[in-house]
Amino acid sequence: MEARDVLKRPVITEKSSEAMAEDKYTFDVDTRANKTQVKIAVEEIFDVKVDSVNIINYKPKKKRMGRYQGYTNKRRKAIVKLKEGSIDLFN
């Protein structure tokens, strides 16, 4: 899997914005990607050094639209902590 396939999009929420002050950045990643692939992708794309990677899996939720029932997509989110002295990603 290539680096551009691993990272889907950055997650910009109030909670993730507060974590940016601690050099923690949040990304939606491919559901098949592991911590090592996420680390390599962030280092390759943004040219920074990664300290640690934490991954959170979200299960699909059951949703209804009238009489039709289905599920939302499952997601995988990665929280990447950069080493001190690295530059800001989104500034």
From Swiss-Prot:
The UniProt keyword set, sorted, is: Ribonucleoprotein, Ribosomal protein, RNA-binding, rRNA-binding
GO: which molecular function terms? rRNA binding; structural constituent of ribosome
Instruction: One GO cellular component term, please give it.
Output: ribosome
- Judging by the UniProt lineage, the source's domain of life is Bacteria
A biological process (GO) of this protein is: translation
Question: Which Pfam families does the annotation name?
Answer: Ribosomal_L23
- Output the InterPro entries linked to this UniProt entry: Nucleotide-bd_a/b_plait_sf, Ribosomal_uL23-like, Ribosomal_uL23/eL15/eS24_sf
| Record's keyword annotation contains Ribosomal protein | yes
Does the keyword section mention Membrane?
Answer: no
Subunit structure, as described in the record = Part of the 50S ribosomal subunit. Contacts protein L29, and trigger factor when it is bound to the ribosome.
Q: Which PANTHER family match?
A: 60S RIBOSOMAL PROTEIN L23A
HAMAP family xref list: Ribosomal_uL23_B
Family as reported in the entry's similarity comment: Belongs to the universal ribosomal protein uL23 family.
The entry's function note states: One of the early assembly proteins it binds 23S rRNA. One of the proteins that surrounds the polypeptide exit tunnel on the outside of the ribosome. Forms the main docking site for trigger factor binding to the ribosome.
Name it. Answer: Large ribosomal subunit protein uL23
Q: Which organism is it from?
A: Staphylococcus epidermidis (strain ATCC 35984 / DSM 28319 / BCRC 17069 / CCUG 31568 / BM 3577 / RP62A)
Q: What is the lineage of its organism?
A: Bacteria, Bacillati, Bacillota, Bacilli, Bacillales
**This protein's encoding gene:** rplW
